[in-house]
């Protein structure tokens, strides 16, 4: 039986930006807002709220973010799979980023309602800010 998780929809809309491998990281990313930065041997990828997105770079726009609402140990088994299976079955693509103990799912805003329904149907629960 899969994990049943509590999820939260973040308010911001997100952009996934691709920059050259050795590009300088724009200074806006030192300001403390949530963002994800990954430099590889191929590129520099940044996932950020729209208002922080760098200009004049390759981008995918219109993403929303769902996150797990509670911390999970790094060695938890099946957490991501329990989320991805529901979305995959519904035909929804997703990009997953994990921090030390939180999972973030980035999906196209046009699929947000369908994704929410699929995750709820699988037994996951959505919580809201108080």
Question: Can you describe what each PLM-predicted range is?
Answer:
Residues 1-86, 90, 117-130:
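Regulatory modules associated with amino-acid/nitrogen control
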Residues 7-8, 109-113:
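Non-transmembrane, interaction-prone segments in cytosolic or luminal domains
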Residues 76-110:
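A structural feature that tracks compact, well-ordered secondary-structure segments
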Residues 106, 114, 120:
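Acidic/glycine-rich phosphate/pyrophosphate-binding loops and surrounding catalytic core
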